[in-house]
């Protein structure tokens, strides 16, 4: 277990890798759920990502809330649970997801960075980060991902901000936050 306001359960593989000082890469789980990609593309993406991390010599650590427990590292027998999940969990939702014993909460970039940090993992990979939404000047719609990137001591490897966002606004916000 990692320290924090709630416990974080590490898989045996992730725990052993960290104890042995081997590389571990945290992964979000929203993209692998039906909230991120339709089936069967979500399962194919999951397999490709896990294989890519392993072929690079690291241990993949999928983050999620499973049966009310914040998890870092899932076994193959748990993959179906995230593939079919429909409850997205951001960093603000982690305490609720754990306290209310959500059956499955797939994690956003912000939640994944938080769980990775609590677990002592310093590298996180994702396809795209959230950012400043178009029209944010009126709506205030800015992803929690940006705040997490600024505050969690975890390197994020990503293709960049999602294309539907206000990319200029996202870059400005990242600059303001010192990212």
Where are these regions (language model features)?
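Short, basic, glycine/proline-bearing loop/turn elements
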Residues: 1-3, 35, 90-102, 152-159
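C-terminal binding/interaction regions
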Residues: 114
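N-terminal glycine-/serine-/threonine-rich phosphate-binding loop
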Residues: 1-55, 118
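Phosphate/pyrophosphate-binding betaalpha-module
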Residues: 119-179
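Catalytic-core regions of core metabolic enzymes
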Residues: 4-15, 38, 104, 138, ...
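Glycine-rich oxoanion-binding loops at beta->alpha junctions
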Residues: 87-111, 138-140
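General beta-strand structural signal in soluble alpha/beta enzymes
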Residues: 25-27, 60-65, 98, 104-106, ...
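Glycine-rich nucleotide/cofactor/substrate-binding loop typically near the N-terminus or early
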Residues: 29-39, 43-98
């Amino acid at each position: 277990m990692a320290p924090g306001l709630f416990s974080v359960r590490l898989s045996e593989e992730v725990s052993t890798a960290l104890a042995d000082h081997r590389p571990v890469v945290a992964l979000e789980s929203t993209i692998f759920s039906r909230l991120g990609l339709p089936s069967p593309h979500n399962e194919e993406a999951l397999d490709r990502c896990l294989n890519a991390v392993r072929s690079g010599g690291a241990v993949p650590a999928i983050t999620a809330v499973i049966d009310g427990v914040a998890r870092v590292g899932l076994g193959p027998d748990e993959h179906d649970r995230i593939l079919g999940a429909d409850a997205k969990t951001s960093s603000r939702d982690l305490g609720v997801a754990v306290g209310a014993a959500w059956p499955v909460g797939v994690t956003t970039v912000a939640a994944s960075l938080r769980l990775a940090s609590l677990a002592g993992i310093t590298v996180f990979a994702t396809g795209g980060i959230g950012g400043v939404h178009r029209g944010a000047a009126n709506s205030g719609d800015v992803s929690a991902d940006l705040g997490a990137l600024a505050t969690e001591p975890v390197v994020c490897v990503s293709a960049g901000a999602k294309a539907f966002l206000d990319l200029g606004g996202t870059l400005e916000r990242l600059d303001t936050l010192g990212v």
